[in-house]
Amino acid sequence: MLYEVDGSGRRTDHKATGNGEFADFPMVLLANGFSASASEILAGALQDYDRAPVIGDTTFGKGSVNILRRLENGGGLYLTFAKWFTPEGRPIEGTGIDPDIEVVSRDSQKADIDQLNKANETLESIVAGKGALGSARP
């Protein structure tokens, strides 16, 4: 499903397991600048596998793997020791995931409504059989 690369360049693959119960379930994914970390990993994987179009705005760009080390003096040290990449090798850290269908507005409430409307329209198109799931990409 995705992989991480640590500071020494070692790659670790992470694959999804299960019986694929919802493998053919039509879906879209809403995202914006507040979508970060695990939600970006999911968005990137769904895009790379043409499983669901991402609708909205570019995500936050938090694709690092971090750990907090407690120090003897009571302080702490926050360390980044790896970075996440999508299945196709796209970095998430600092760039985020760009949507397949961009829907943005300066008014966040309007943007939410517009994104929901576009998601509904796109999902109806997928369900109606007007192309494969990934065909919702521009």
Residue ranges, per PLM feature:
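C-terminal recognition in membrane/secretory proteostasis and scaffolding
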Residues: E4, R70, V103-P138
